[in-house]
Amino acid sequence: MSAARLGFVTPKKPPYYLITALLLSLPNAALAVGACDKTEKSSRCEDSLTVQASSQPQSTYGSLEVVTQLASRLGLTNLETPRSIDVISAQAIQQRGDKSLAAVVERAPGMSGVASPTLSNNFSLRGFRPVSWLYNGVETPGSTLQLADPSHYGSVEVLRGPGSVLNGLSAAGGSVNLLSRQPTFSRQPIEFDYGLSSYNSQRLHLGAGGTLVDDVAAYRLDVSGSDSGTNVQYERDKQKRVSGALLFKLSDYALLTLSLDRMLNRTNNPYYGTPLMEGNIARELRDINYNNLTDSRIQSNATSFQASLDWFTTPEIELHNQFYYYSGFREWRNVERFRISAATQPGYVNRDSFGALAHDDDLIGNRSSLVFDRPLGGFDNRFIVGFDLSKRRFQYYSNGFPGSEEVPLQAPIRESFSQGTASQRSPVRHVTQNQYAAFMEDRFSLTERLTLLGQLRYNHMDMDWHFQGPQEERSAQTYAFSVWSLGPSYALTDNINIYANYTTGKEPGNDLFFLSPAQTGLPLTRVRQWEVGAKGQFWDNKGEATLALYELRKDNLFVPNAQQPDTLNAVGQQTSRGVELSLMLRPSDRWELAANAAYTHARYDEYRGGNPLRSYNGNRPAYIPDWTANLTARYMPTEQWGLTSSLRYVGSSYNDDANQRKMPSYTTLDLATDYQITRTVGVGVRIRNVTNQLYAYQRTYPDQVLIAPSRTYESFISVRF
């Protein structure tokens, strides 16, 4: 590993990635320029630019008219797609003041979970965890994206259920697609957002965009930074992010978009949890940080580059090409397990697992597709065919989590990492994944109101594991599989659709990049889902509602041991059934309501575990609540003054597979008020966790929980000019 990376700076890499992108994109663009008839179809490129600009949600919470990318690449709206999708607009993110992606997605129907130092992607949907994360439609490794400032996104899409037909190996429960803010030729205001909150926390966002050269080039640029603390001693988080994009109108038919995103993050003394006292949360320990080492940190950096060519060759044929590159590095240096029961002295706590580890991740790939929009046998038909090539390299370093010591429970000693262990990280495994895939979709209109969406993907993947250390070992495996989806959609009216869908998927039994040598020969997990639902607008488009019922099943899977997160247990079959409902109302210009609720009945069907061995059949998986619900209401007494309240309910869940340790349900309340001083300047105040409720939202070890942040206040100013 280079000294530059150890110093929290990603080393400069050769520019051949950028050159490759341009070579892939520009030859096609040149053809488009040559073939362009500017008099006959000059409006077509203008229309495409308008579509690109308006594909983001225009209202705060309504999303059925939005063109989505997460469930189909055919350019269908949410209403037209026979899958359950939620779209969170940039306006909603800003109005709620979401500081993180966790805050953005946790209010989506059925979403539950947490992002924490030890469980960076422990979100669940439809009874399964984790979820997949995509950036502009590309499934992206690592957890750095989840730490990034959400003000850089034009919208965030949430798909419930498998996404394998679009992305190959993908989480069964659902996927989240982060769509960056895009350049357009229409005027975009200059944006300034600043917030000052509890614990001397600050955050800043600057944004601008618009035309560089009339009808030739446009840009979008966003810059953000934050420095925040919490009620937990010594914990401090700093983030920096710059993202930008250039849009070139190569001809009346061709558009080229180049985007670059750079993220930096460092958290000193991250909170790893609080030890339980006789199985209960002790309020007096709420603010104590047992990971108070003088050099404790988590730091990461990531760079993403994408080049997208959209060529509208004829009114019936489109070519799309997307080159993508991602490089991320993240390192940890912490002590993370705390047990009162293991201490030999009264009034002390044992802390162990002094971990020094790092992830080094690189992904490069290219996706190309052709879209045909022409009648078939007299019926409207839209068809896409394409291929996807990618290569990912992953290097994992660890010190094995040694070290143990006892410290006073009320005042743990603050010392350096080396006092707990002298063991430093070393290479553990190097994994390479080479993948190619072919995919197709077809939306066939059987009648004016009845359509059928079919999707098929073939995936071929070569994996190579190099296990490093005292006993070096190599292993290789080839995976080849096909997945498909089929779903009819029927328009009861112009604004109300009902649909059904059956989709299959594949998922690794565990993360392929963290398999042990003995696990590399295991088959992939099989995923199947049935879904029926309805979605529509009503009351003169003042209301939107969605309803989905589903059954989701996985065979031959692994689940993390609830008491030992680094240990995996084999499960033969797990099934989840449930219902999800969302409602959005705009009764008047002064009122806006958004509500959703989800019931999840997740159970193990075939699972034996524990010591001694026993059946867990019929038990609920750990960390999966049965009910979740969200309600957001906004009232404007005047045109300038707004009041917002948000309620969130998460039902009880178990922290173990035996269903013996139960985590109680909780309800939180957030309040906000804002005032538009002038047409360009607005100010406001937010209060999070108004009731200062004390509750645990996750258990990382048997006798250790993550306690939710205490009440916080934030004042903010937003300027648009």
PLM region spans:
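Acidic/polar loop-and-plug regions of large Gram-negative outer-membrane beta-barrel proteins
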Residues: S226, T230, S243-K249, Y253-F312, ...
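Gram-negative outer-membrane beta-barrel transporters
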Residues: R449, K542, E551-R553, A570-D657, ...
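Outer-membrane beta-barrel translocator/receptor signature
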Residues: S151-G154, V165-G244, L250-A254, T303, ...
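Membrane-embedded beta-barrel scaffold of Gram-negative outer-membrane proteins
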Residues: S308-F312, E316-Y324, G328-E336, A491, ...
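C-terminal beta-signal and adjacent terminal beta-strands/loops
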Residues: Y649-D656, D674-F721
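Structural signature of Gram-negative outer-membrane beta-barrels, strongest in the C-terminal barrel
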Residues: L247-S251, L255, D361, D380-I384, ...
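Acidic, small-polar-rich N-terminal luminal/periplasmic segments of exported/outer-membrane proteins
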Residues: E46-R187, V532
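Face-selective signature of the C-terminal outer-membrane beta-barrel domain
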Residues: F305-G328, D352-F467, T546, A594
